[in-house]
Curated annotation (Swiss-Prot):
Biological role stated in the UniProt entry: Involved in peptide bond synthesis. Stimulates efficient translation and peptide-bond synthesis on native or reconstituted 70S ribosomes in vitro. Probably functions indirectly by altering the affinity of the ribosome for aminoacyl-tRNA, thus increasing their reactivity as acceptors for peptidyl transferase.
GO cellular component, one term: cytoplasm
Listed SUPFAM superfamilies: Nucleic acid-binding proteins, Translation proteins SH3-like domain
UniProt-recorded name of the protein: Elongation factor P
PROSITE patterns: EFP
Keyword Protein biosynthesis: yes
InterPro entries given in the database record: Elong-fact-P_C, NA-bd_OB-fold, Rib_uL2_dom2, Transl_elong_fac_P/YeiP, Transl_elong_KOW-like, Transl_elong_P/YeiP_cen, Transl_elong_P/YeiP_CS, Transl_elongation_fac_P
Organism: Methylacidiphilum infernorum (isolate V4)
Amino acid sequence: MFVNASDVGKGQAIRHNGAICLVLETMHRTPGNLRAFVQMVLRNLKTGKSFVERFGSQDKVELLSLVRKRCEYSYREGNNFVFMDPETYDTFSVPEEMVGKAKDFLKENQPVDLLFADDTLAAIELPQSVILKVVEAPEGVKGDSATNVMKPAILETGLCIQVPLFIKEGELVKVSTTEGKYLSRA
């Protein structure tokens, strides 16, 4: 389906120069006395490379439909992460470059959404928050509680975040996947 470039938003998939691309960001610009244009940050799904492209606001682009599949993270195999569809038991091997920062929040059997455009994996969507175990946290020093003092803690995935002083090793904490910050005890 062809639509105006100005109607395309973040998270949608388009076909650009024959390649399937995921829209990472869109900006509408109207410089001085020039025509308005739409600037998009796109990621080519075949190469994994991101680039910036400009379109006139009336230019037509081919919009692709995204299919969402609920899967579970299974294991890591070299530089790939393997996800499984719990209904069909199909597995999907995803390169580390595509997983990106999401790897800091993945643990075995973690539910995630895989987005497909024309049977090509487009993106990985994590839940808003995940529950992870603290594997290393230094003890808080007595008298440090005058204000909201935080200390570093290492989680089971290797992610290091700031947590309140009362969090101890072995506890479960709720972490925001968008900001990578401590939310609460689990």
